[in-house]
């Protein structure tokens, strides 16, 4: 309990007496009780206030260093992903479209979907907002049920060709440690 910022008094409380952040800390403590090497964190901060999110993220980083943990961190908040991750996998409709070291992926996104995602990260500085190019996609997200045997992003991609609509691209290493599944990236 101490590792996750709780004390002995918390052991005698009922579930309804805990805040969202405390409940999340309890969940993390339960996961750590078996001394894992690998922890899956599926949206671990999505329902928390921003201040509590920062506390939980910092705690996760400290626990990672202290216990030598490896995380599979699943999240939609790309700023959080950048903060917590060493390597990032971007997926679209259940298919991996890009994989690289965090710094490399954020500095040089290659897949059009990754570019769209990164262009959507909010910028706090109004001067930078005017300079930032936001990439918009058109169309509806296709059904993930029985997907076509082609690029999953082709229907919405501004660069899609007939090859994209006819053939599923393979995940290829285009620079050392940077993999992308896109026919347009050579």
For the regions a protein language model found, what residue spans apply to each?
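Charged, flexible cofactor/metal-binding loops and thiol motifs
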Residues: 101-186
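Conserved ABC ATPase "signature" region
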Residues: 1-9, 115-119
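Interfacial catalytic loop of ABC nucleotide-binding domains
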Residues: 12-14, 132
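A short, proline-enriched helix->beta-strand linker immediately N-terminal to the Walker B motif
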Residues: 33-37
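P-loop NTP-binding/switch modules centered on Walker-like glycine-rich loops
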Residues: 40, 44, 48, 52-130
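Conserved ABC ATPase signature
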Residues: 14-18, 22
